[in-house]
């Protein structure tokens, strides 16, 4: 039996996790630190050291060890969590992938990726603006991708626009606070721009791809109804494609109505669509009343179906943000719960921990996971990680901190 963990399922899990921090019956998460002593490798036989720490193991015994080694923990706020995607930075002369609805292992992207969400179909600029690549095919009678060639984009409008030979969609700008907190060398946070999302139309056809430019076609601008399952599909009230033929070949998709093929009317409700260029299906006017054959031979255009909700409706879903960044900062001793005089080697997250000796879920902003001993009198001093033994019971403990 063949099975697949879909992108939608991964995204659902990530969204459920982030939502669990702020929903009405929210879970309580703490980030913990632990293990003040060096890695010795004695327990698992790996020979691990602080220089070459061991790979964490997913076992019952290791879970108990992690609890036993905990030193302190800090509550994770909902503002400490965000969905994220692999970081892709804009750079001129770089070939980015373009958005398409049908990538697979049998139909890979220009970079060789077998899925949309593992491709390079979006990028971030130096001003933290994030754009989706709608087309990477330059204008003219072209069907192949090319490198971006132009200045860094700055547009923040809701319409598609052309720059550097690419057709782009502005998605959102990473806020200064989120950039400081969540932007890393490998990942970048995802936000939703309310203006962009409000302008999106579910099932609108927003892009095309010329797969065969044809030969000997009659120059001019033509219009064709986009067939499919959209509202009023196949009629002048549905989605309509604009086909520009120059030098007897179909021009690539773009946003310039006079020189590029594109979308005259986007329509709505499409989950599949086709364009028929045969005689009787193309027209010289955008009301589709005067038939005009394109002539020649060949010529083919694919309809690219937009994501559910339309481009820009939901950046988290559209960009495949099934990764999550958690950023909680330990700052000093924090109410004397966080150690300041020793080191640690384990970092992790625990959900709904209870207060010691009860079944009540902890709510304090910081908690300590160590016992405290107060001596009536002390001779000498203790050192971090020193092993101490109680003479009467032979109980053994390790010193994490000592305050004289």
Task: List PLM regions with ranges.
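Conserved, function-critical positions that sit in or immediately flank catalytic
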Residues: 161-404
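Tryptophan-rich substrate-binding surfaces of secreted polymer-degrading and adhesive proteins
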Residues: 1-201, 302-304, 352, 361-362, ...
């Amino acid at each position: 039996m063949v099975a697949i963990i879909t992108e939608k399922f991964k995204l659902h899990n990530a969204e459920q996790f982030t939502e669990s921090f702020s929903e009405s019956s929210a879970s309580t998460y703490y980030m913990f630190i632990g293990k003040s002593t060096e890695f010795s490798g004695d327990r698992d036989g790996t020979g691990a050291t602080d220089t070459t720490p061991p790979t964490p193991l997913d076992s019952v015994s290791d879970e108990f060890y992690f609890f036993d080694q905990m030193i302190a923990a800090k509550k994770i706020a909902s503002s400490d969590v965000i969905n994220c995607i692999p970081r892709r930075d804009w750079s001129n002369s770089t070939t980015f992938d373009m958005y398409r609805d049908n990538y697979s292992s049998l139909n890979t992207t220009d970079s060789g990726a077998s899925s949309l969400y593992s491709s390079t179909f979006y990028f971030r600029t130096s001003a933290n603006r994030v754009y989706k690549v709608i087309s990477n095919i330059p204008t003219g009678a072209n069907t192949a991708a090319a490198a971006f060639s132009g200045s860094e984009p700055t547009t923040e409008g809701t319409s598609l626009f052309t720059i550097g030979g690419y057709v782009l969609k502005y998605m959102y700008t990473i806020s200064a606070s989120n950039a400081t907190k969540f932007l890393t060398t490998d990942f970048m946070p995802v936000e939703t721009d309310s203006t962009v999302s409000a302008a999106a139309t579910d099932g609108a056809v927003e892009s095309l791809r010329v797969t065969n430019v044809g030969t000997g076609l009659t120059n001019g601008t033509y219009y064709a109804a986009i067939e499919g399952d959209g509202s009023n599909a196949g009629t002048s009230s549905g989605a309509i494609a604009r086909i520009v033929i120059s030098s007897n070949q179909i021009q690539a998709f773009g946003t310039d109505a006079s020189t590029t093929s594109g979308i005259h009317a986007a329509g709505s409700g499409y989950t599949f669509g086709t364009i028929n260029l045969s005689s009787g299906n193309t027209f010289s006017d955008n009301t589709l009343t005067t038939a005009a054959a394109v002539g020649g031979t060949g010529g083919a255009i694919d309809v690219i179906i937009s994501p559910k909700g339309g481009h820009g409706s939901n950046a988290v879903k559209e960009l495949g943000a099934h990764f999550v960044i958690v950023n909680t900062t330990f700052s000093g001793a924090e109410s004397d719960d966080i150690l300041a005089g020793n080191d640690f080697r384990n970092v992790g997250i625990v959900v709904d921990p209870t207060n010691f000796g009860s079944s009540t879920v902890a709510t304090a902003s910081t908690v300590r996971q160590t016992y405290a001993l107060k001596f009536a009198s002390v001779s000498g001093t203790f050192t971090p990680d020193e092993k101490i033994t109680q003479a009467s019971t032979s109980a053994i403990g390790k010193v994490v901190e000592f305050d004289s």
